[in-house]
Design a protein with these regions (language model features):
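Donor nucleotide-sugar binding/catalytic pocket of nucleotide-sugar-dependent glycosyltransferases
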Residues: 1-25
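Conserved catalytic-core segment of nucleotide-activated headgroup transferases in glycan assembly
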Residues: 16-110
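Short glycine/serine-rich donor-binding loops of glycosyltransferases
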Residues: 138-141, 159
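Short alpha-helical donor nucleotide-sugar binding micro-motif in glycosyltransferases
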Residues: 110-113, 118-123
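Short hydrophobic beta-strand element within catalytic cores of glycosyltransferases
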Residues: 150-153, 163, 170-171
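Acidic donor-binding loop of glycosyltransferase active sites
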Residues: 121-135, 149
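C-terminal "capping" alpha-helix adjacent to the active site of nucleotide-linked donor transferases
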Residues: 176-229
């Protein structure tokens, strides 16, 4: 008697889409609370706020500043997440002031469940320019799709499998040294000379996100409400 081979499908991380469904009332309240006007554009980053172990914010700051200048639109950058310590928080706040002074910066506590879900409603665009080797699947682009938002993300790891370029949003060219060039970093981590935290931070300094391409992607979405709707609906 033959024994039927069991099905063993691989099911990726998922989200409860109903929690992210667009709601006009919630959107109006969230935008009013943040003083985001009807004609303003809000760009959302959600996740850990860590320049060495998640995503260095400099490419995002520079690209949004350029997009704000080129489009003439009033832009808001919502960074909803959490900091590991006060030093990192101050670095993010100072960086926003120094590198995107023309963009209104909002920092929200993403550890609060009510914030983590409602803040999606305030946004017009989602972004995550991750540059870190610890980034694997990446759940937030899936949440952005559930919220009906177009995405601007780095061309990185799991993001490549979820965000189809010019269909759901834009994947921004992200460069790393050739294979094998990180052997010294791997050796110091494997030999317990460097912690995993330091290993991630050191490795991230060799990654470059194309700021000009990111600015162009932001600009295209900022200028064109129909494009935002079309890419958001495709997700």
């Amino acid at each position: 008697r033959d024994f039927p081979r069991p099905q063993l499908p691989v099911i990726p991380l998922g989200v409860d889409c109903a929690k992210f469904a667009p709601d006009a009332g919630t959107r109006a309240r969230q935008r009013a609370a943040l003083n985001i006007g009807d004609d303003d554009i809000a760009v959302l980053y959600l996740g850990r706020l860590s320049f060495h172990a998640k995503a260095h914010p400099l490419p995002m700051y520079l690209a949004l500043e350029r997009a704000a200048r080129e489009t003439g639109k009033r832009l808001h950058l919502i960074q909803a997440g959490w900091f590991a310590n006060d030093f990192i928080e101050q670095a993010f706040r100072d960086g926003a002031k120094d590198f995107c002074p023309g963009v209104t910066a909002h920092f929200l506590d993403g550890r609060r469940a009510e914030t983590r879900f409602a803040v999606w409603q305030a946004a017009d665009i989602f972004t995550s320019l991750s540059d870190n080797i610890q980034e694997s699947f990446g759940l937030t682009p899936i949440e952005a799709m559930a919220a009906g938002l177009p995405s601007v993300v780095s061309d990185w790891d799991g993001y490549r499998d979820t965000v189809e370029h010019e269909v759901h949003g834009y994947r921004i060219a992200t460069l790393a040294p050739p294979a094998g060039q990180g052997a010294d970093l791997a050796d110091t981590h494997a030999g317990e000379i460097d912690t995993y935290d330091r290993y991630c931070g050191y490795a991230s300094q060799f990654i470059a996100v194309d700021v000009a391409a990111a600015a162009a992607a932001y600009g295209a979405l900022i200028r064109d409400a129909d494009l935002r709707r079309r890419l958001g609906a495709a997700a």
